[in-house]
Amino acid sequence: MKLTRHNGRSGKHGTYNPRHNDRRFDVENSEHIDAERARQNVYWDCYRGFTTHEFRENPEQPDFSFEEIERMYYYEHYFDHVEAQNARNEKTRHTERNRTVEDLLKNNKTCPEESIYQIGTIGESVPPDTLFSIVNEFYEEFERLFGSHIHILDWALHLDEGTPHIHERHVFDCENRYGELCPQQEKALEELGIPLPNPEKPKGRNNNRKQTFDAVCRTILFDIARRHGLHLDQEPSYGGRDYLEKQDYILMKQKEQLAAQEQKLEELKLDRKS
């Protein structure tokens, strides 16, 4: 069996819309979706955590679509940047460059990136709870390593199509030179210490930090799958292991420094008492 993680932001009809992921359309008339099994899907978003079909049907619970969740997140975190950039455009008399938060959500450079996780095919897969456990552990590790600059906005476990799979959407961000938080992928990855695949060569389409980041994510996923007893077909993932080992080394050094500082403080306290 294969474990796959595919990423993208847009297709021939423009940027991907999260309505497909949280089933905000008439599933009864969709050929590839089993409407009855759709009630078993599991959803998660960054504001409410886990939700289910039953949660949506409860009139006492606030119901927000993934589209609304992403809009709220972008307004909360990037509105100040949009306003400040528009003000700078007015100063330089280039108001044609003005943008809105909605524009950030529609532009394929600043909109959320979508990842699809799947193990196996229609003929051979793993139980949904196994996929759920593996990907949930992956998200915890993802947050630990990248959470300062990459934010998971929402995800859905689909059990209503041929093979169980998960659609997840995230945004890369960091501060620009004006100190404003804004969506920017390459700069966010640089801030996280993600190296170029070939550091000695110039950055470009075939040599960028996103390639290393994706390799790191694949390495983490396969490590977690192995812990669950799965031995999956794996293509070489160059750079992923090196980055993780480097991060573990940095963390170990930080712990050693903290322990040394705490010991020094204890010694100072003892000196004062004596």
Residue ranges and their predicted role:
Residues 1-272:
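N-terminal nicking endonuclease/strand-transfer module with a His-rich metal-binding environment
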